[in-house]
UniProtKB/Swiss-Prot annotation:
GO biological process, one term: translation
GO cellular component annotations of the record: chloroplast; ribonucleoprotein complex; ribosome
HAMAP family the record matches: Ribosomal_uS8_B
Function recorded in the entry: One of the primary rRNA binding proteins, it binds directly to 16S rRNA central domain where it helps coordinate assembly of the platform of the 30S subunit.
A Pfam family annotated for this UniProt entry: Ribosomal_S8
Subunit structure of this chain's protein: Part of the 30S ribosomal subunit.
Classification via InterPro entries: Ribosomal_uS8, Ribosomal_uS8_sf
Organism expressing this protein natively: Oltmannsiellopsis viridis (Marine flagellate)
Gene Ontology terms, MF aspect: rRNA binding; structural constituent of ribosome
Spans through the membrane: none
Lineage start: Eukaryota, Viridiplantae, Chlorophyta, Ulvophyceae, Oltmannsiellopsidales
Compartment list: Plastid, Chloroplast
Swiss-Prot/TrEMBL keywords: Chloroplast, Plastid, Ribonucleoprotein, Ribosomal protein, RNA-binding, rRNA-binding
Protein name, as recorded: Small ribosomal subunit protein uS8c
Length: 129
């Protein structure tokens, strides 16, 4: 049993990218589905499908002949031992807006751009670039 499903998800994606795997199976949780949906919407992965009540299947995305991963770095910001919260004015920009920060708000999980547009603050979950 994993205590932190977000860190587990990010680590599995990072490790699969390092060995250039096409598909990845992860545990099916609501948070995992939301993060994968945002990764798909932002263009970091090809697809996310529900295999069963316990599994999600991710199709990872690579660029060019060298098959460079679309995800350069995944970083967990708010951890179970140290939660990080920010108002919409203080949500950090990653690589001057080239990267994406996922924010857990009262309206659900969303990207930093969407949270700033809706003027919602919340917990800074992770960053992707």
């Amino acid at each position: 049993m994993v205590n932190d499903c977000i860190s587990d998800l990010l680590t599995r994606i990072r490790n699969a990218n390092l060995v250039k795997k096409e598909k990845l199976i992860i545990p099916n949780t609501r948070v995992s589905r939301n993060i994968c949906a945002l990764l798909e919407k932002e263009g970091f992965i090809d697809s996310c499908q529900v295999n069963s009540t316990e599994e999600l299947a991710l199709q990872l995305k690579y660029k060019g002949r060298e098959r460079k991963p679309c995800i350069t770095n995944l970083r967990r910001i708010s951890k179970p031992g140290l939660r990080i919260y920010a108002s919409y004015k203080n949500i950090p920009k990653i690589l001057n807006g080239m990267g994406v920060v996922f924010v857990s708000t009262s309206q659900g999980l969303m990207t930093d751009r969407e949270a700033r547009y809706r003027k919602l603050g919340g917990e800074i979950v992770c960053s992707v670039w």
